[in-house]
């Protein structure tokens, strides 16, 4: 999703809130927390580690060791469906991803790439950050 699309989506959400259409409590609480730590003008998640460090983290990851053989299947499924599949560590940093050409470009434009940090405190309200917060 491009920056202009993100801004439009934000306006839509803000307009809904102005009309009294409250989000699910869990989402509203996340927005409140994010206001303290996230730059509202940011259009991409921070990618602040070197590729070699990401590779080392992925190689050492317990998920990687248990997913041997699944990477190829996930890659094929992601490419065939033109979607993005990703695995993060316990801190919300993407360690591995694969995707179809179109969605991979979109993912790259918002920092949804290996090394990208998708924790609620660094990138705002998002599914990965919320899952981490809830322990799911």
Language-model features: locations:
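Intrinsically disordered, low-complexity terminal regulatory regions
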Residues: 1-121, 126-130, 134-136
């Amino acid at each position: 999703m491009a920056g202009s699309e993100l801004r439009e989506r934000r306006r839509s959400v803000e307009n809904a809130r102005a009309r009294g259409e409250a989000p699910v409590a869990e989402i509203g609480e996340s927005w409140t927390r994010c206001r303290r730590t996230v730059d509202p003008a940011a259009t991409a998640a921070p990618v602040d580690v070197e590729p070699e460090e990401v590779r080392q983290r992925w190689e050492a990851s317990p998920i990687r060791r248990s997913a041997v053989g699944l990477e190829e299947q996930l890659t094929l499924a992601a490419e065939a469906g033109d979607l993005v599949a990703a695995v993060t560590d316990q801190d919300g940093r993407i360690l591995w991803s694969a995707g179809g050409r179109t969605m991979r470009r979109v993912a790259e434009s918002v920092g949804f790439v290996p090394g990208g940090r998708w924790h609620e405190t660094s990138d705002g309200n998002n599914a990965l950050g919320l899952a981490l917060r809830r322990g799911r």
